[in-house]
C-alpha cells in the first residue's frame, strides 16, 4: 500500500555510479567479472540483478533518512562540512582516469553524497539518544572452551576420570578420544542457551565440567579462557549497533510507510557492470569510516 506522499530520490547519475562502482568492485576485485551473469537466487536472477536490487534498497533508505533529517532540522556544523570536504577531496584524488571514465562523477557530487550519508548517520544518532542502547560485558561475553564428544555415557565417564586427574592434558585426551575433530570452540553468552552453553558459562578458568548430554552425544568441557576480552569487545560493539538499528527502525518504518521514496524508473538503465574495465575503486564507504569511526 502506498503512503500518503511519494517522492523521487534526488540522486545524480554520477552519485548512482559511485555507489554502483563501489559495490561492483568490492566483489569484482576479489571474484573477477565472471560472477555477474551467475544465477544468484531461485528466481533465476543474476548476481548483477540481485546486487542492483540491494543497492536500490540502500539508496531509497538513505534518501528517506535524509528527508527525515531535513524535516527534523538536522544540520551540519562548519567543522563537519570541512571534514566532509577533506574526505571528498581525498576520495576524488584517489580515483584513476579509468574510475572517472566509468563513473562520470564530479567532486561536488561526491561531496553532496557524503553530506547526505553523514546527515543520515547524524539523524540516527540524534533520534536514538536517550534510549537504552547499553550492552553489558556480561551480555556480550565470549569464552573459549575445549570439548570432548563421546558416543556413550560409559565412554564419557572413563574419559572424565582421566580428565580430572592432576596434570591431565585435556587437549591430548580430546585428540585421542573425541568423536568430533573440533576440539576448540568460542561460545557467546545468550539468554537462551542450550545445555552445552549453560555448562560452559558455569565453568571458571581451567575448570572441567561433568558430563553434558546433548543431541545424542556426551560432552566434557574445559574452560580455557573464561573471558575473551578482544572477542567480547567486538561482540559488544556489534550488539550495540544492532540495538541502535532496532531502535531507529521503530522510528524509520512508520515514517517510510507515510513518506514513500522511489528511485527514477531509468536508474539502472545506464549501469552496466560489464563496462568500465580498469575501474577498481571500492573505498567510498571504508574511507568514510576512517574519517568518522566512533
Q: Where in this protein do the model-derived segments appear?
A:
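N-terminal targeting/tethering segments
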Residues: 1-103
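A general structural motif at alpha-helix termini
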Residues: 20, 85-88, 174-178, 239
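PPIase-associated folding chaperone regions across multiple families
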Residues: 99-158, 192-294
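Soluble non-cytosolic domains of exported or imported proteins
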Residues: 46-63, 75-82, 109-118, 150-154, ...
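Peptidyl-prolyl cis-trans isomerase
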Residues: 159-196, 225, 229-230
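Surface-exposed patches in mature extracellular/periplasmic domains of secreted proteins
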Residues: 72-81, 170-174, 209-212
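Sec/Tat-exported extracytoplasmic proteins
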Residues: 27, 59, 63-76, 88, ...
Amino acid at each position: 500500500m502506498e503512503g500518503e506522499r511519494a517522492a523521487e530520490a534526488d540522486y545524480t547519475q554520477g552519485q548512482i555510479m559511485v555507489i554502483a562502482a563501489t559495490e561492483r568492485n568490492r566483489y569484482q576485485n576479489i571474484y573477477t567479472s565472471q560472477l555477474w551473469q551467475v544465477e544468484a537466487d531461485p528466481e533465476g536472477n543474476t548476481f548483477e540483478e540481485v546486487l542492483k536490487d540491494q543497492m536500490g534498497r540502500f539508496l531509497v533508505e538513505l534518501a528517506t533518512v535524509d528527508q527525515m533529517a531535513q524535516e527534523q532540522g538536522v544540520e551540519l556544523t562548519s567543522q563537519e562540512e570541512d571534514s566532509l570536504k577533506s574526505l571528498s577531496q581525498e576520495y576524488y584524488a584517489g580515483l584513476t582516469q579509468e574510475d572517472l571514465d566509468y563513473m562520470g562523477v564530479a567532486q561536488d557530487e561526491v561531496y553532496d553524497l557524503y553530506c547526505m550519508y553523514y546527515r543520515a548517520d547524524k539523524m540516527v544518532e540524534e533520534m536514538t539518544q536517550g534510549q537504552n542502547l547499553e550492552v553489558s560485558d556480561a551480555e556480550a561475553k565470549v569464552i573459549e572452551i575445549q570439548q570432548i564428544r563421546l558416543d556413550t555415557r560409559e565412554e564419557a565417564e572413563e574419559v572424565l576420570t582421566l580428565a580430572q586427574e592432576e596434570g591431565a592434558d585435556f587437549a591430548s585426551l580430546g585428540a585421542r578420544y573425541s568423536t568430533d575433530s573440533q576440539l576448540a570452540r568460542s561460545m557467546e553468552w545468550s539468554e537462551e542457551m542450550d545445555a552445552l552453553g549453560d555448562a560452559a558459562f558455569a565453568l571458571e578458568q581451567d575448570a572441567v565440567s561433568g558430563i553434558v548430554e546433548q543431541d545424542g552425544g556426551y560432552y566434557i568441557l574445559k574452560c580455557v579462557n573464561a573471558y575473551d576480552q578482544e572477542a567480547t569487545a567486538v561482540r559488544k560493539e556489534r550488539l550495540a549497533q544492532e540495538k541502535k538499528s532496532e531502535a531507529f527502525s521503530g522510528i524509520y518504518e512508520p515514517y517510510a510507510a507515510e513518506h514513500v521514496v522511489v528511485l527514477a524508473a531509468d536508474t539502472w538503465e545506464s549501469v552496466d557492470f560489464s563496462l568500465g574495465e580498469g575501474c577498481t575503486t571500492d573505498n567510498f564507504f571504508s574511507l568514510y569510516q576512517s574519517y568518522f569511526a566512533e
